[in-house]
Amino acid sequence: MVTVLTIFIASAQTLRIGKGRVELTAYPASGPDATAVIVCPGGSYFWHDKVSEGDSVGHWLQRQGICAFVLRYRTAYVPAFITHFRLIFRGNRYPDPQNDLREALRYVRAHATEYRVSPEKIGVMGFSAGGHLVMSSVELFPREEWPAFIVPVYPVVTMVEPWVHKRSRRGLLGDSRTGNRQLRDSLSLEKHIPDGCPPVFLVNCEDDPIVDFHNSVVLDSALTARKVPHVYLRYATGGHGFGANCRKGSAECRTWRRHFLTWLRSLNL
């Protein structure tokens, strides 16, 4: 596999991995044996929020001594949103984003020495549809390829009524498969929490106007039932899409970053 490296900004590097428009932007940490986090921005599996849920997150993690990798995974893209061409043509759809995350995990592990990170300390963090993507890693990937920890922030979780985010379902499944009940069920994450699931740090807000907050409620219940070590921060206010942007959300929801860092240290990876 050929990897193309270009300079993105002074403190980051963008690498093209896998197929299509898949890119990984690295924000290297300064110390040795660092923790690494692969960040998956949201966007309903149609596009990416590369600012609040991508670059802002990468810079924030880097400042904390964490090596961040922001993943531009394959999405359906805007033409698929405004038309229904995927009724005829395949386009980008499941399992493309999942395959891209799997490839990113493999890449970071293979280049752990280069980035001065520990292969045993590579976690994943995702926002909205990206939260669904990172949580699906332990349900769809072989156990030996699991991340060390998972951070879904205001995630899409279920693909079935009544709490489904329909735009994300359409983006992931494609127009020709949105009615496939078996596929919907298999990608409803609350139904398939595996034994030995890595620790999870879950965040959402009750006033989320985009992804119904019950998505996180059912995930929390499933994690509890499977005795998965996890933290669930459920804020009253904050809405959706705040990521690591200090100008978005509410004062209370923006504390999630501080709580995450405390939790991460408690894992003693």
Model-derived features with residue positions:
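Short beta-strand/loop motif that positions the catalytic acidic residue
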Residues: G196, L202-N204, D208
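C-terminal catalytic histidine-bearing segment of alpha/beta-hydrolase fold enzymes
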Residues: P79-R86, V217-L269
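Primarily recognizes the serine-hydrolase "nucleophile elbow" in alpha/beta-hydrolase
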Residues: R102-K166, R184
